[in-house]
Regions:
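Short solvent-exposed coil/turn linkers within tandem alpha-helical repeat scaffolds
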Residues: 14-21, 50-56, 85-95
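Canonical tetratricopeptide repeat
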Residues: 26, 63, 97-100
């Protein structure tokens, strides 16, 4: 339930333009955990645009793919799973992506 209380804090940080790539990622994670996948996708996208080399990119790609899957957008889900596998083949996230991709 920390997600409910931390979201406004992250939104204030965004307003102050404080580390916008990271803050968008953490906001996306909050919305993802609350099953608000459309909002999560929006924040993941902003984060990736601002810093596509961040250490959290494998998680961002995996959670984006799962979010697309949850909102029944299989094409984008497949695309994100494939990108994750291509860019981070030895990551734990890529292992999950491979499993999830076979189910689509």
């Amino acid at each position: 339930k920390k997600y409910d209380t931390s979201t406004p804090k992250y939104e204030k940080l965004l307003e102050a333009n404080y580390k916008p790539a990271e803050v968008n990622f953490y906001l996306a994670q909050n919305w993802y955990m609350r099953k608000k996948y459309d909002v999560a996708i929006s924040h993941y996208k902003k984060s990736a645009i601002l810093n596509d080399k961040a250490a959290y990119m494998p998680t961002l790609l995996l959670h984006s793919a799962i979010s697309f899957e949850k909102i029944k957008d299989k094409d984008n889900a497949k695309s994100f799973y494939s990108t994750l596998i291509d860019l981070y083949p030895s990551s734990n996230e890529a292992k999950v992506a491979k499993q999830n991709l076979t189910k689509l």
